Amino acid sequence: MAPAPTPAAAAGRRVAVLAAALVAASLAASVGVANAAVSYDRRSLVINGRRRILLSGSIHYPRSTPEMWPGLIQKAKDGGLDVIQTYVFWNGHEPVQGQYYFSDRYDLVRFVKLVKQAGLYVHLRIGPYVCAEWNFGGFPVWLKYVPGVSFRTDNGPFKAEMQKFVEKIVSMMKSEGLFEWQGGPIIMSQVENEFGPMESVGGSGAKPYANWAAKMAVRTNTGVPWVMCKQDDAPDPVINTCNGFYCDYFSPNKNYKPSMWTEAWTGWFTSFGGGVPHRPVEDLAFAVARFIQKGGSFVNYYMYHGGTNFGRTAGGPFIATSYDYDAPIDEFGLLRQPKWGHLRDLHRAIKQAEPVLVSADPTIESIGSYEKAYVFKAKNGACAAFLSNYHMNTAVKVRFNGQQYNLPAWSISILPDCKTAVFNTATVKEPTLMPKMNPVVRFAWQSYSEDTNSLSDSAFTKDGLVEQLSMTWDKSDYLWYTTYVNIGTNDLRSGQSPQLTVYSAGHSMQVFVNGKSYGSVYGGYDNPKLTYNGRVKMWQGSNKISILSSAVGLPNVGNHFENWNVGVLGPVTLSSLNGGTKDLSHQKWTYQVGLKGETLGLHTVTGSSAVEWGGPGGYQPLTWHKAFFNAPAGNDPVALDMGSMGKGQLWVNGHHVGRYWSYKASGGCGGCSYAGTYHEDKCRSNCGDLSQRWYHVPRSWLKPGGNLLVVLEEYGGDLAGVSLATRTT
């Protein structure tokens, strides 16, 4: 039983109640309706007058196809979720300044309406910064070149563009009647994203920017609460929320705000060159139960379905095309068991206790050295309890309310009536299902080689080296750097080939001299910068040096995005010459954005028919390959096995599957116990093997016959090893 409150504590509670009332009034005013359909108090969100424990899952609409959305949403509902959470992806919706796109995978309105049809709510994270391992953190690249712009700080040009986009999204949602008070599913919005950690390094403009963002958002009058995640100083009425593997330590910045977990990480992302992360469901369920037993009322699984970084949407750099995230619904839309089923059972147990959980604060009883009981008691006599064992190795028997209960190590049992343990986080009853890839199609190939020794009419010349993104504006991963060097009679007298050294900000680079390939180098997720050092054969007279710089996704984390660079920044030197070392950095360079095949549209049916294709190109670098195939029978998800190839990009019927790369994972993959604190380097697989081998091709992109597969291979690979497979469990 809780002790009687002291007079000081009672006074403090009266102050808290008064403050909560003032915030509720402020919230009602800010949402622009007389009686807000969605509000909050210290225990939870309040929807139409009812406190709710809400279980949510992230499904990002551009990471799957519209044809997949209904099935994914239904599986989320069947798994016991109340809410679907998604970011809004600015660079997908405004790829060119002032030109908007809301079709196909970016049909946000259609996605939100499908959630409504399924009877679920929506948490709309407008941002518009998203991070999300998404290219440039969701910012459109054109924003980098707005005069005077400085990202995520108290900067006029940046704030003007950000406000314009936020207001556009809010206006669109209102016009479609999609906020809850309009009869729609949106119960909550988010502005900015994980900015709190940036404030300490963001300078004097950081805190004013965060306050401006909150006030700007509230002024849009969405009619629902706004949140800011990882923002401890979020001003009223905005709710600050938690992201992480665990959030039971978290408390909101005011005692009249609810405790909300906007990102409960179900796993982690995969990077090219990194192992594949897995999070045991026993630990994930333990983390969620810990949060709920401490008084948490909103949990969102990030991700519930991760999906695919189609096209060039992956960020990082070096984020893989798969965004599976070890989520309860896998990249292909299939249930990951036992994770999905075990969490479903957890949700059922929590929902049984919901009326008590939202009506009382827990009291804590010690029932052992590492064991505690969190007990919720309602005024009507209802009772719910969470029995916790924090020991990582030892199962125990505990007594509670006169009964004995078995608690496995690192686990929590839920008793919705304070008597019957209906669920234990470490007791998994759902069988494990192992997915299988079933090869069904091999290909007959034709090839077309890029001309590495010619320049198009679009090429242009500048003095010195130029940063890549300022030239490409991310319209292509590729930028050619070409220069000429004159070798005199005496330069080669030693008989030794000159040594070319090229320093680059990243991310991958190939070197050609007089049309001949001299290899490639690349960085990695932890350090994208790279240096090429190689002997190159040259002759007396003029020699052509061509460097193909390739981006592998733009960074997605940080604040001053305007300062980030890609490409060859130099110096570029030629040494081992009798005349000494030549610094080529400041001479004239000719630049060409993209590859010839991109300009010709070789990835499309029309473009691929406009050139003469030859026989299979084998291990030749910078070669396009195409093949036609029939769709596999049935409805099982489909994937391409690219493990025999090098690095490049894929298209099917003109749809951009994404980047592929047979980059082997470094590091160690040790044992994996569910017990003990989880982190992203724990429980990894594929060390010493490919980070990603299989690439998802959505069924809706296929027709029964005559499907066109186009592969752009940068390094060279074995075409005979490429196959199409179906995925089953």
Swiss-Prot record:
PROSITE patterns: GLYCOSYL_HYDROL_F35. Keywords: Apoplast, Glycosidase, Hydrolase, Secreted, Signal. It is an enzyme of class 3 (hydrolase). Pfam families: BetaGal_gal-bd, GHD, Glyco_hydro_35. GO terms for molecular function: beta-galactosidase activity. It catalyses: Hydrolysis of terminal non-reducing beta-D-galactose residues in beta-D-galactosides. SUPFAM superfamilies: (Trans)glycosidases, Galactose-binding domain-like. It comes from the Eukaryota. The active site is at 194 (proton donor), 263 (nucleophile). GO terms for cellular component: apoplast. InterPro entries: BetaGal_gal-bd (IPR048913), Galactose-bd-like_sf (IPR008979), GHD (IPR041392), Gly_Hdrlase_35_cat (IPR031330), Glyco_hydro_35_CS (IPR019801), Glycoside_Hdrlase_35 (IPR001944), Glycoside_hydrolase_SF (IPR017853). Its EC number is 3.2.1.23. One of its GO terms (biological process) is carbohydrate metabolic process. Residues 1-35 form the signal peptide. It is found in: Secreted, Extracellular space, Apoplast. Belongs to the glycosyl hydrolase 35 family. This is Beta-galactosidase 4. The lineage of its organism: Eukaryota, Viridiplantae, Streptophyta, Embryophyta, Tracheophyta.
